[in-house]
Amino acid sequence: MNVMQKPFIAKATINIGVGEGGEKLTRAEKLIETLVDQKPVRTYSKVTNPEFGIRKKQPIACKVTLRGEKADKIISMVLSGLENRIKASQFDKEGNVSFGIREHIDIPGVKYDPDIGIFGMDVSVTFQKPGHRIKERRLRPKKLPQAQRVTKEESMEYMKENFNVTIE
């Protein structure tokens, strides 16, 4: 295979949506920090929704973006908590994959801490091919050619080869 056609993991994003600020959100931040050794960033609501009791610009979640070796390590940890199984519907047409884990204690090596409680989390993995910079650069950005876009099948194959994932 051509070196420029091999997909790779650009980033992995872990998100814990709490739905409210305060003590519960700080516990979720503490969990992410102990899980990946990196400080999370808070995300804020964009609109007011009185049914959920959320006001605009209120902190409701926290997330962390991982790249390189850290991303590979955390993806393999979380996938082993899911018994290395992913549905084909969890891949989008750009080749990215998103999956959730119901309870963080399902991840091997993570123990229950009564101070933190139990949280679920969403994991999103973004795939790219070399040459993606032409789309994101500041000067003279160009459209990404079709050959440099990651397809659903390519990312499925990557996950099977590198993480021993069975796709249902």
From Swiss-Prot:
InterPro entries: Ribosomal_uL5, Ribosomal_uL5_arc, Ribosomal_uL5_C, Ribosomal_uL5_dom_sf, Ribosomal_uL5_N
GO molecular function: rRNA binding; structural constituent of ribosome; tRNA binding
Native organism: Methanosphaera stadtmanae (strain ATCC 43021 / DSM 3091 / JCM 11832 / MCB-3)
Subunit structure: Part of the 50S ribosomal subunit; contacts the 5S rRNA and probably tRNA. Forms a bridge to the 30S subunit in the 70S ribosome.
GO cellular component, one term: ribonucleoprotein complex
HAMAP family: Ribosomal_uL5_A
Pfam families cross-referenced by the UniProt entry: Ribosomal_L5, Ribosomal_L5_C
Family: Belongs to the universal ribosomal protein uL5 family.
Biological role: This is one of the proteins that bind and probably mediate the attachment of the 5S RNA into the large ribosomal subunit, where it forms part of the central protuberance. In the 70S ribosome it contacts protein S13 of the 30S subunit (bridge B1b), connecting the 2 subunits; this bridge is implicated in subunit movement. May contact the P site tRNA; the 5S rRNA and some of its associated proteins might help stabilize positioning of ribosome-bound tRNAs.
Domain of life: Archaea
Any single biological process term in GO: translation
SUPFAM superfamilies on file: RL5-like
Protein name: Large ribosomal subunit protein uL5
This protein's UniProt keywords: Ribonucleoprotein, Ribosomal protein, RNA-binding, rRNA-binding, tRNA-binding
